[in-house]
């Protein structure tokens, strides 16, 4: 409004998340009292064409753009040009912005919300769209979700280095819908190889690919936090959502991140179609147990909203809800009003869920009865009090995928050969001393095993471009020595695994 009043010659374009989801059927000409153009989906080509049209003084070719012509809102998508691939979009240029003069609004209560707004993060994307793309509450029919296109780790690190040079800031927020675990692994290795001193965080799916070792690698590369959707902590509803995870699996993944020193934030949901009162209570109990186990540090409850571009919005009858109206408005058209056939008033749970979570995040009131959070009667939970504890019971996994990558994050050991004598017999032994950032430790092996390991640690160092697979190490070991599995699960190698010998 201020710009239009004082600088009417400046053209103003709107794009991004709000436009992409809410304004796809825009027809209200009043919007154009404030904006000259509204573009949808990927913004690079639409913006380029808008600039070309402004500079040439014509209104010919556009890409997914609303504009006003003869007092009527028109949607123009008549350019034959294709959108830019993610590898071609280049690095965001922040060099002209007064980055040190923006105000930080700090949210104290929620650790993840505080991180979002306390200070500034360089924003990047690992992949366009979502590699999962199935969640039924999500706008999976729109391009920003359904068109999945990952970016190579090398290109991402090039962009990170450029942005560090521009801004002098080394913190990165990857704004992915859900960052792909395999790409996160490659990015972490590339960051370590380039010796980039960065901190970063992103959104994920709590899937089983996030093993203990992968989480340790991500932490070593500078990952400080992840946020992911637990949504409704009920296996029946997670299946209906098509989340592709179970509560038990989420618990294990959050444990892996937490033990690696990475903060975990969970998006929580209530009021999903067909959700019963019992399931809401049980969901709260699951969340309580996750905080009690110390594997969740931050969370936020969202009430389910039905959107026009989600499977629930497109096929409400499959989810036991009835759309109240099919009328399309002239402005925002995404959030839909609906009637849940269960007839449950989910609003009544809002205050109790949020109040309990507020306390859980402070590590208090975990022993309260769930009834204490509500001023109306709720049923007893059906979840066993030790459900999460049992899910987290350690199981030693002796199976390793043959094609798993083996990486050593540590440095070169100092080596000392010695002879051990007992009952008249003597053996040649080797002592390997390692110097970690925090401590010094040593392991002892037979002379031959020690020599083999010293050579191999050099080959599997994170600094090498070529990685070694588990099956390659096994074959190489058994060429010279005997049972590799016995060696791999022996006490000295188990010690190394605690200090950065990773299987990915």
Question: Which sequence ranges carry the predicted segments?
Answer:
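Acidic/polar loop patches that form or flank catalytic/metal-binding clefts of enzymes
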Residues: 58-62, 74-76, 148, 170, ...
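N-terminal [4Fe-4S]-dependent radical SAM core
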Residues: 71-123, 438-442, 498, 502-504
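Glycine-rich beta-alpha loop elements in corrinoid/cobalamin-binding modules
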Residues: 1-83
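Radical SAM [4Fe-4S] cluster-binding motif and immediate context
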Residues: 92-263
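Short, well-ordered amphipathic alpha-helices
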Residues: 2-4, 51-52, 187-189, 283-290
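Short, solvent-exposed turn/loop segments enriched in Gly/Ser/Thr/Pro and often Arg
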Residues: 18, 176-180, 301-309
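A structural motif corresponding to the C-terminal lobe/cap of the Radical SAM core domain
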Residues: 35, 192-199, 203-383
């Amino acid at each position: 409004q201020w710009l239009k009043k004082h600088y009417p010659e400046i053209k103003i374009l709107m794009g991004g998340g709000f436009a992409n989801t809410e304004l796809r059927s825009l027809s209200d000409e009043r919007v154009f009292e404030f904006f000259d153009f509204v573009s949808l989906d990927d913004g690079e080509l639409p913006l380029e064409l808008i600039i070309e049209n402004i500079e040439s003084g014509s209104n010919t070719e556009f890409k997914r753009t609303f504009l006003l012509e003869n007092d009527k809102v028109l949607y123009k998508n008549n350019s034959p040009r294709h959108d830019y691939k993610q590898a071609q979009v280049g690095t965001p240029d922040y060099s002209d912005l007064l980055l040190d003069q923006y105000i930080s609004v700090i949210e104290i209560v929620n650790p993840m919300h505080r991180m979002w707004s306390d200070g500034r993060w360089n924003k990047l994307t690992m992949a366009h769209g979502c590699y999962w793309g199935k969640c039924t509450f999500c706008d999976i029919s729109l391009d920003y979700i359904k068109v999945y296109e990952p970016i190579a780790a090398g290109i991402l690190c090039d962009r990170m280095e450029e942005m560090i040079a521009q801004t002098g800031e080394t913190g990165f927020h990857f704004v992915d819908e859900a960052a792909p675990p395999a790409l996160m692994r490659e990015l972490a290795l590339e960051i370590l190889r380039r010796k980039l001193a960065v901190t970063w965080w992103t959104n994920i799916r709590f899937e089983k690919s996030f093993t203990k070792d992968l989480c340790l690698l991500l932490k070593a590369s500078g990952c400080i936090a992840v946020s992911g959707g637990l949504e409704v902590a009920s296996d029946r509803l997670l299946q209906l959502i098509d989340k592709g995870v179970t509560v038990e699996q989420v618990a294990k993944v959050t444990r892996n991140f937490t033990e690696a020193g990475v903060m975990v934030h969970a998006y929580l949901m209530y009021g999903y179609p067909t959700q019963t009162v019992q399931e809401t209570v049980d969901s709260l109990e699951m969340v309580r147990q996750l905080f009690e186990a110390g594997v969740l540090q931050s969370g936020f409850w969202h009430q389910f909203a039905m959107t026009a571009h989600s499977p629930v919005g497109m096929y409400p009858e499959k989810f036991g809800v009835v759309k109240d109206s099919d009328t399309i408005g002239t402005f925002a058209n995404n959030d839909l009003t609906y009637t849940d056939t269960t007839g449950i008033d989910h609003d009544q749970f809002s205050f109790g869920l949020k109040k309990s979570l507020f306390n859980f995040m402070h590590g208090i009131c975990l022993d309260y009865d769930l009834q204490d959070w509500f001023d109306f009667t709720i049923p007893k939970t059906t979840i066993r009090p030790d459900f999460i504890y049992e899910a987290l019971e350690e199981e030693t996994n002796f199976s390793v995928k043959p094609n798993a990558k083996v990486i050593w994050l540590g440095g070169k050991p100092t080596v000392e050969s010695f002879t051990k004598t007992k009952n008249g017999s003597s053996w040649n032994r080797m002592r390997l001393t390692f110097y970690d950032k925090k401590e010094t430790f040593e392991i002892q092996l037979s002379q031959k095993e020690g020599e083999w390991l010293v050579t191999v640690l050099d080959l599997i160092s994170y600094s090498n471009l070529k990685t070694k697979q588990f099956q390659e190490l096994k074959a190489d070991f058994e060429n010279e020595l005997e049972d590799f599995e016995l060696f791999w699960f022996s006490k000295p190698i188990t010690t190394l695994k605690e200090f950065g010998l990773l299987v990915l």
